[in-house]
Amino acid sequence: MAKKSVIQRNINRLKLINKYSAQREAIKNEIKRTSKVEKKISLYSNISRLPRDSSKVRLRSRCWVTGRGRSVYKNFGLSRHMFRFMASNGLLPGVVKSSW
């Protein structure tokens, strides 16, 4: 299990991402449309004034059962350990162990 504080930090980042996503996208689109260098520099400084945690890159995909941050399958939201456990116990519908 991951520490509760680490999981909570990720949740807080998700809230910030949702809060500032429209503002961040508007600035990015303006940067793409602008050809003047001075204007682009000022727009980049506007992006840098936004909170760091409002960037999507800082969000970590975590297992919804254990909170593990590494080796998480996006389609299921599970770490490899929980995926194997749940699939072998038949808790994931449609997942079948392959054999050939």
UniProtKB/Swiss-Prot annotation:
One GO process term, biological-process aspect: translation
Alphabetical keyword list: Chloroplast, Plastid, Ribonucleoprotein, Ribosomal protein, RNA-binding, rRNA-binding
Principal location: plastid
GO CC annotations, alphabetized: chloroplast; small ribosomal subunit
Entries under Pfam families matching the protein: Ribosomal_S14
Domain of life: Eukaryota
UniProt GO MF annotations: rRNA binding; structural constituent of ribosome
Subunit structure: Part of the 30S ribosomal subunit.
Function: Binds 16S rRNA, required for the assembly of 30S particles.
Family: Belongs to the universal ribosomal protein uS14 family.
Protein's UniProt name: Small ribosomal subunit protein uS14c
Lineage of the organism: Eukaryota, Rhodophyta, Bangiophyceae, Cyanidiales, Cyanidiaceae
